Regions:
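C-terminal "post-core" interaction segments
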Residues: 1, 5-134
Length: 134
């Protein structure tokens, strides 16, 4: 990747920052209730091959909106203003994001305080760490 050396962010050259990133194993949870940036963030995570996604498919909702208040201040609308285009020219909007490991949380387990997505993610990450340490 190209590095632009004359960019300074908060007193650091932009190219200095990637060497300070987290580079240990990681995993990300996603669920069917994710919306907007909660669709964009796991998409980038998967696209950059940072780690696995665990949970349920995320509907394609990655579009930025401008929040507009009408004359009646109780009426507020999000007007889509920015679409996020992929390298192939398609948009993230209406593009469902599938997890690497599909796990649903059922109402029966949630009311007991159990999170099967979190448990699956932790188990998978521990397996990855264990296999790296062999």
């Amino acid at each position: 990747q190209m590095c632009i050396r004359d960019r300074v962010v908060r007193g650091r050259e932009a190219c200095d920052m990637p060497s300070r990133r987290w580079n240990k194993p990681s995993i990300m949870l996603q669920c069917e209730a994710n919306y907007s940036n909660a669709h964009g963030t796991p998409w980038v995570y998967k696209h950059q091959k940072i780690g696995k996604l665990v949970g349920m498919p995320v509907p394609g909702t990655m579009t930025s909106v401008s929040w507009e208040t009408l004359q009646d201040p109780s009426l507020v609308f999000g007007i889509p203003i920015i679409g996020y285009r992929l390298p192939d020219g398609s948009y993230l909007e209406n593009s469902q994001l599938e997890p690497d490991i599909k796990v649903a949380n059922s109402p029966e387990t949630v009311v007991k305080g159990e999170d099967m997505q979190l448990k699956t993610a932790v188990d998978e990450l521990l397996k990855e760490i264990d296999s790296q340490n062999r």
